[in-house]
Amino acid sequence: MTVEVGADENPDFAHDETDGAGDESDDEDAQGRDPELDLAVQYGDEIGDAQRKSLPKRKVIAEWLEPAIFSDTQFTVRFVGADEGRALNHSYRHKDYATNVLTFAYGEEPDGVTVADLVLCCPVVEKEAREQGKTLVAHYAHLLVHGALHAQGYDHERGEEDAAEMEALEIDILAKLGFPNPYR
């Protein structure tokens, strides 16, 4: 789900654990270099120390996101509990339930950098993985790739053709990362 908001409208998502992670990738931008990923990872108040240890680490998140970015990006990935997930979904989408991933796309900076926050609701992600018979790691990877594509303008809710394009990209990126098709 993509939410278009102005950067000044959402101060709760300050980029606080930031350092670049522009490693090798198959995609190069117009200047002939790999897109750079500036990544911060945050945890909501409901995410305790024990749960943090079980979540994907920053390096792994960067490895999953890098093949899904097509230009320089500045992402904050925030892991939240059910209460924060529900509050955000209600505030920005007027839906009174927590959803698996929300993408807050702030658009492109003048220098062409795509800026977005990807918010993952841990209890929802865990429940879906169990119900769908997926590993938790594969489901987190899928939702991060999904959110990254939303941040760059892909939208499965615009119609069948757009949905098919986004789904095909997700399947291809996840296959390159060694994950199975998430839609089977």
Curated annotation (Swiss-Prot):
Cofactor note: Binds 1 zinc ion.
Binding residue positions for Zn(2+): 146, 150, 156
Any matching Pfam family: YbeY
Name used for this protein in its record: Endoribonuclease YbeY
EC numbers: 3.1.-.-
Gene assigned in the entry: ybeY
Organism encoding this protein: Burkholderia mallei (strain ATCC 23344)
Biological processes per GO annotation: rRNA processing
Record-stated family: Belongs to the endoribonuclease YbeY family.
Enzyme class: hydrolase
Keywords, ordered alphabetically: Cytoplasm, Endonuclease, Hydrolase, Metal-binding, Nuclease, Ribosome biogenesis, rRNA processing, Zinc
GO MF entries: metalloendopeptidase activity; RNA endonuclease activity; zinc ion binding
Cofactor: Zn(2+)
Annotated region (Disordered), positions in chain: 1-37
A Gene Ontology cellular-component term: cytoplasm
Keyword Hydrolase part of the UniProt annotation: yes
Localization per Swiss-Prot or TrEMBL: Cytoplasm
Compositional bias per record (Acidic residues), positions renumbered to this chain: 1-11, 19-29
